[in-house]
């Protein structure tokens, strides 16, 4: 479960409610990756440290969303604080220019030098940004995983960019169809022409 991701209505929950949800999921033995989106860095780091304390499996880390969006130094400090708050949890940095800030390769690798728990990059900016991430981030470091974040770029991400996972909104409504699409995309990436045709059709339909 990706809990309290960007589309997970976390602004509607109190901090206590969010953390109670994490604890309940972990207690129920459901693998849980925790979104750390918050209105300030202090709250984001609190969610990260709580996730590690109760036994979550990982973190999703997004930029500051309400202030100092374009500031590189502010965003680096924000990312670093979250990664430092849960050093034992693998973390994926989430890029989306909709937050007013684009995470690029220089910042990502600067953080990765300091934080070994930074293991992945999720791209939500669309096909062009996904291509950028593949060319300048994940292809430069084989230990960094590329995750797809836009429903309409699943085929492009797997087949053209070497993505290893997809975190989608449509998957909540059509889980079987999205899993089937991903299976077809993996086969297409390995050269299966029939799977490629079917994957493109299903990708466009969804």
Residue ranges of each PLM-predicted region?
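Active-site beta->alpha loop and helix N-cap motifs at the rims of alpha/beta catalytic domains
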Residues: 1-102, 110
């Amino acid at each position: 479960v990706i809990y309290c991701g960007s589309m997970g209505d976390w602004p509607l929950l109190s901090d206590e409610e969010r953390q109670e949800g994490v604890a309940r999921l972990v207690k129920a033995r459901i693998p849980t990756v925790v979104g750390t989106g918050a209105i300030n860095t202090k709250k984001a780091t609190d969610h990260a440290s709580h996730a590690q304390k109760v036994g979550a499996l990982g973190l999703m880390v997004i930029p500051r969303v309400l202030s100092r969006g374009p500031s590189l130094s502010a965003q680096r400090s924000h990312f670093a604080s979250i990664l430092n708050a849960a050093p034992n949890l693998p973390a994926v940095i989430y890029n989306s220019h909709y937050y007013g800030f684009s995470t690029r390769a220089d910042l990502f690798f600067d953080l990765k030098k300091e934080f070994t728990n930074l293991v992945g990059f999720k791209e939500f900016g669309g096909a062009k940004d996904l291509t950028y991430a593949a060319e300048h981030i994940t292809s430069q470091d084989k230990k960094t995983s590329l995750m797809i974040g836009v429903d309409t770029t699943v085929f492009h991400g797997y087949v053209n960019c070497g993505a290893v996972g997809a975190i989608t909104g449509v998957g909540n409504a059509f889980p079987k169809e999205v899993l089937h699409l991903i299976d077809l995309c993996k086969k297409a990436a390995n050269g299966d022409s029939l799977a490629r045709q079917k994957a493109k059709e299903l990708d466009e339909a969804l």
